[in-house]
């Protein structure tokens, strides 16, 4: 029997709005293309600290959703790691300490999210790691629709 090798040794998959195991484009890619996948969620200071966009109800819903996701992952023999820091700092630390060679995410389209992903991509490039992002939450890529601008 022929042994198949995968493209990546260790991938980091970062959950964001996609708090599910089923029908998750980026997660499926990571599982199919990496020998090992680290699953994490990163609370950024902007989500937690008081600001005009923060909602206690939204934060509570996110925490409850993460608890449900963690139970699903544990039931499948995995682990969900939770972090609190600027995402690019966590990514850099995990790349160095865990020898991650790919960071995988599903795209998000808010101005904040686009800037966040640009910083993560720059961190990955600086450290020689692949950054893979996928359209997942929408039927059509957000900026492919006429009249939709960045």
Where do the protein language model's features map onto the residues?
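Trp/Phe/Arg-rich N-terminal binding region typifying the photolyase-homology
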Residues: 2-150
């Amino acid at each position: 029997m022929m042994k198949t090798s995968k493209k990546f040794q260790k991938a980091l998959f970062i959950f964001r709005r996609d708090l599910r195991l089923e029908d998750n484009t980026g997660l499926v890619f990571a599982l199919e293309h990496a020998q090992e996948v680290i699953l994490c969620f990163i609370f950024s200071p902007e989500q937690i600290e008081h600001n005009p966009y923060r909602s206690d109800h939204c934060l509570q819903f996110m925490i409850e959703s993460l608890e449900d996701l963690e139970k699903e992952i544990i039931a499948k023999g995995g682990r969900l790691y939770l972090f609190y820091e600027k995402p690019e700092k966590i990514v850099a630390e995990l790349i160095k300490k865990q020898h991650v060679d790919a960071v995988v995410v599903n795209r998000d389209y808010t101005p904040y999210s686009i800037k966040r992903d640009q910083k993560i991509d720059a961190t990955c490039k600086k450290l020689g790691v692949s950054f893979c992002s996928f359209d997942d939450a929408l039927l059509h890529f957000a900026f492919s629709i006429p009249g939709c601008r960045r």
